[in-house]
């Protein structure tokens, strides 16, 4: 069974959670800095819905990253996986956060992967989502085999066959987004290859044609109407 806890995570006692071998964390990512010393909301303005968190709320959002070492200290996991957006690597406190984890005897590797290329455990996702995974393991333990997770199937024109793609980083890069910072290449001839991806139709119900706004029986929310007017 899965236990769900609705709480203020910053004040939650991690020892109330049962011990586990692996800790998986996906800290809130909306308000991480996109450039050192500049807050994301201040740099880019309001979000898609015209909303901007107060600076105190944005700081609390970024502070969820610190719950990772807090829970890890309590449970001493054999391995820890932290999933987040690429911008977390540019967070001004990222190096200090890494130090907190390595001080507890963990080694780590930062992995960049787009969800549309995540074929290792089954079908990938039919949408492009760049993510970073910071994978920790206890020093002395065998490092996890992560390369197998980064080998999506791809067609190599020169070799004339399907191959397992290999990440090829642009000069000076070791983490980042697909195409912007890295590509995939054939392991044999080293030509650039394009991994297999699923179309959006793979997860869309094309028989559901939806409802026209004019045919709705319930009125739209005031905020929705404001956005429609702004768009018109």
List where the protein language model places each region.
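Conserved active-site and SAM-binding loop architecture
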Residues: 1-232
